[in-house]
């Protein structure tokens, strides 16, 4: 009997929500949101990050001023223990999600590899 792929995806969603890194991420995010200085700095970082991504997607040049502003914000972020913990935890969770993505994509990878070898 074949499993419904959507049911498996919901099981995966539940497993991620129950993952210790995800729980720590939620706690870290709440701690950042509860601290006005951390929240403001994190919001500034996210705004800057989205602005740079938007420029890149539109093919606009990232200026030296953009780079300098980004470096200044990152330097301040590194001084904030709450944000640093949040970002480290998010990075660990991203590694797990990346690993899961590789596993999910394996059938397609094998299919195309077999097609190229034929």
UniProtKB/Swiss-Prot annotation:
**Residue spans crossing the bilayer:** none
> What InterPro entries does the record tag this protein with?
Com_YlbF, YheA/YmcA-like_dom_sf
The record's annotation in Pfam families points to: Com_YlbF
> Which superkingdom does the taxonomy of this entry point to?
Bacteria
Query: What SUPFAM superfamilies does this protein's entry cite?
Result: YheA/YmcA-like
- Belongs to which family? Belongs to the UPF0342 family.
Name under which the protein is recorded = UPF0342 protein BC_0880
Which species?
Bacillus cereus (strain ATCC 14579 / DSM 31 / CCUG 7414 / JCM 2152 / NBRC 15305 / NCIMB 9373 / NCTC 2599 / NRRL B-3711)
């Amino acid at each position: 009997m074949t499993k419904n792929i959507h049911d498996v995806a919901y099981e995966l969603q539940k497993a991620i929500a129950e993952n210790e890194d995800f729980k720590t991420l939620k706690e870290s995010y709440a701690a950042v949101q509860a601290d006005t200085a951390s929240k403001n700095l994190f919001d500034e970082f996210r705004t800057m990050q989205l602005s740079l991504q938007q420029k890149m997607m539109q093919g606009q040049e990232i200026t030296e001023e953009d780079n300098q502003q980004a470096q200044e914000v990152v330097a301040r972020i590194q001084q904030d223990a709450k944000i640093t913990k949040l970002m480290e935890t998010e990075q660990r969770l991203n590694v797990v999600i990346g690993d899961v993505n590789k596993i999910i994509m394996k059938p397609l990878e094998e299919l195309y590899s077999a097609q190229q070898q034929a």
